[in-house]
Amino acid sequence: MLKQSEAIVLRTYPMREADLLVTLFTRAEGKIKGVAKAAKKSRRRFGGALEPLTHVRVYYEDRERQELTRLDSCDVLASPMSAEVDYPRALALGHVAEVIDDLLPDREPNDAVFRLSLAVLGQLVPGAVWMPLTYFDLWMVRLAGFLPDLMHCVVCGEELDDRAFFHPLVDGLVCANDKRLASTELTVESRAIADLMFRAPLENFAGAPWPRQRCADLRRFLVQILERHLEKKLVTVTMLDKLD
């Protein structure tokens, strides 16, 4: 029996001569893996619907005693290919896919992450990737339950004033008195923006100038949290760090 769901294509891998192994983040069932038979040959059933980060309606069938779903067809609802995909945007799109794929377990629906992902994909336009990336990482850390207290020192418990610091070996922010050597400062501006992002939709921040340097410290702090919990380095972060 065919099921259907909205979904975001995360990754595709060649499988045999004409098939594709596809990882999808579905709204109904969370992350699933399936086989698109003859996807390299059949333009009618799949066309460009299996490009990473495409928003689709997928039709699929779970088969008894088989781990992989059979993908029947996909209808494109929105495609990242509808706008220019320059190198920074390609990396940003890849980062969204990598974090979702690495962080979320299989077969656990998460509507909050699904809605966040669609909102971020809609704002990841050429020349304006840093604001939606900041918003995405911030909310993914929060929705995963990893976000520490941003108002108090994790060591002494005192309220943080105008200076706060983070360190790879400390799970949270610390005050100036308790910071370790080689700590990085999280500025007052970045903490204030994080607070605003928790209280306002992504669209409220669109259109304002957002150079790479803005909230770079916040993104570094969030990536540090993600990588600690994933126990691995995020490949796309290394590549984003190399952008001019």
Curated annotation (Swiss-Prot):
A GO BP entry: double-strand break repair
Entry annotated with the keyword Magnesium: no
InterPro entries: ARFGAP/RecO, DNA_rep/recomb_RecO_N, NA-bd_OB-fold, RecO, RecO_C
Pfam families, alphabetized: RecO_C, RecO_N
Keyword line: DNA damage, DNA recombination, DNA repair
Keyword field contains DNA damage: yes
Disulfide bonds: none
Superkingdom to which the source organism belongs: Bacteria
Annotated Gene Ontology cellular component terms: bacterial nucleoid
Similarity field: Belongs to the RecO family.
Physiological role: Involved in DNA repair and RecF pathway recombination.
Protein name per UniProt: DNA repair protein RecO
